[in-house]
């Protein structure tokens, strides 16, 4: 395999910045949807996805009062609701799940978990749980949650538990076609075991090359495996076998198998330096491997080409965006709460970015262009769907 010169994409790289462009403007009154002439665009703003609808959710700061949770559709406000205990709505971005234009939220209080749909009560659980993931499949809501006062995890279908474990560490809930999938691992007597769950049916994973199994994933119906046989990482599936030399001077933290277009997969091997307080990813793609700086946190968007990586730099004041097309972007003084604040469509990456210092407006970023939303607050989620 090709071993490219190692490089670290850290804060020392030069910045690619662009000015704030003309704003989208929204009503701050009680109306649920502003007039169309209150929304303006210009030639410097990113193009909206063709024949698609762009939804975004966010939190509006209100001086002296609770924040407002708001949902936008193509820049037009759909509804607002106060973030209060009484409404069971939190301003925390981790509790917002924007799926197919519907805003689901989670809220924990007094030993219970409340799930809302567009601000209205939907489900109630008798335990406090952290909602890690949600999927909406043919109007059926799937969720992955971790009890706050118990071990293990639970998968629910429309609020009812359909799969649960009292031990085990789950990764993300994801779709493979219409199949709901999950990987989780257990540790017993210092031995790690990996399981794949497909539509609530679990299967223990056996490494095909008798090496140490690090990861597994279902992609387009096939199981991909990531193994380690010192000094090589092995990424494989049916009729595919790729071997990558490990990076010396680093310790293994974790791994992810990244789904790509054309039924392919790559691997991200998360590493900690033995000589400096920094982390990095060894990326293994096709017959190439290289090292990529990880900053404070990184998120991958790989299902469409070009594949993209979004990295919050180590000092947490810059966002670095790069991809397989060779383009690089820096955005300063912004924060990016979680992976649900990004979406790929038509070969472009759309990100919800908010001002770290609270000054200026949050905006949708796309390929270096910005579409500001004219309110003081933050954007907490995005999704792109076919029009209703």
Each language-model region and where it sits:
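Surface-exposed loop/turn elements that mediate protein-protein interactions on large endomembrane-trafficking
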Residues: 70-81, 112-123, 152-163, 193-205, ...
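Feature 14080 marks short, conserved micro-sites in well-ordered regions
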Residues: 79-91, 97-99, 104-108, 124-130, ...
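Beta-strand-rich domains and repeat architectures in extracellular enzymes and scaffolds
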Residues: 48-68, 86-94
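Repeated scaffold domains used in trafficking and secretory/extracellular systems
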Residues: 88-100, 128-138, 167-177, 210-220, ...
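Sec-dependent bacterial lipoprotein signal peptides
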Residues: 1-14
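Hydrophobic strand positions within the blades of repeat-based beta-sheet folds
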Residues: 56-57, 69-70, 96, 105-106, ...
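Short beta-strand elements that form the blades of beta-propeller/WD-repeat-like
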Residues: 51-63, 102-108, 140-148, 179-188, ...
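Bacterial Sec-dependent N-terminal signal peptides
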Residues: 13-52
């Amino acid at each position: 395999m090709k071993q490219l010169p190692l490089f670290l994409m850290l804060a020392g790289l030069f910045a690619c910045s662009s000015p704030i462009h003309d704003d989208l403007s929204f009503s701050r009154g009680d109306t649920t949807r502003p007039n169309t002439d209150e929304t303006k665009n210009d030639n410097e703003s990113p193009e909206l996805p063709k024949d698609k609808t762009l939804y975004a959710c966010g939190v509006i700061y209100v001086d002296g009062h609770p924040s407002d949770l708001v949902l936008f559709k193509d820049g037009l406000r759909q509804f607002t609701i106060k973030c209060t205990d009484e409404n069971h709505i939190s301003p925390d971005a981790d509790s917002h799940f924007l799926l197919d234009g519907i805003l689901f939220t989670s809220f924990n209080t007094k030993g219970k978990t409340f799930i809302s749909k567009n601000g209205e009560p939907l489900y109630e659980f008798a335990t406090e749980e952290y909602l890690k993931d949600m999927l909406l499949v043919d109007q059926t809501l799937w969720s992955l949650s971790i009890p706050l006062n118990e071990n293990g995890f639970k998968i629910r279908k429309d609020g009812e538990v359909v799969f649960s474990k009292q031990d085990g560490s789950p990764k993300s809930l994801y779709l493979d076609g219409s199949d709901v999938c999950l990987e989780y691992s257990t540790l017993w007597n210092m031995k790690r075991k990996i399981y794949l769950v497909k539509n609530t049916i679990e299967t223990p994973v056996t490494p095909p090359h008798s090496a140490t199994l690090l990861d597994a994933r279902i992609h387009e119906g096939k199981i991909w495996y990531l193994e380690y046989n010192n000094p090589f990482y092995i990424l494989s599936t049916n009729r595919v076998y790729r071997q990558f030399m490990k990076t010396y001077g680093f310790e293994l933290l974790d791994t992810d198998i990244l789904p790509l277009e054309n039924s392919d997969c790559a691997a991200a091997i998360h590493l900690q330096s033995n000589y400096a307080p920094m982390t990095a990813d060894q990326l293994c793609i096709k017959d190439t491997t290289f090292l990529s700086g990880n900053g404070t946190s990184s998120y991958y968007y790989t299902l469409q080409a070009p594949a993209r990586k979004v990295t919050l730099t180590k000092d947490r004041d810059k966002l670095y965006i790069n991809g397989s097309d060779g383009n690089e972007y820096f955005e300063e003084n912004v924060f990016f709460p979680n992976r649900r604040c990004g979406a790929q469509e038509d070969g472009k990456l759309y990100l919800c970015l908010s001002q770290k210092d609270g000054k200026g407006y949050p905006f949708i970023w796309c390929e270096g262009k910005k579409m500001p939303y004219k309110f003081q607050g933050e954007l907490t989620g995005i999704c792109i769907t076919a029009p209703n």
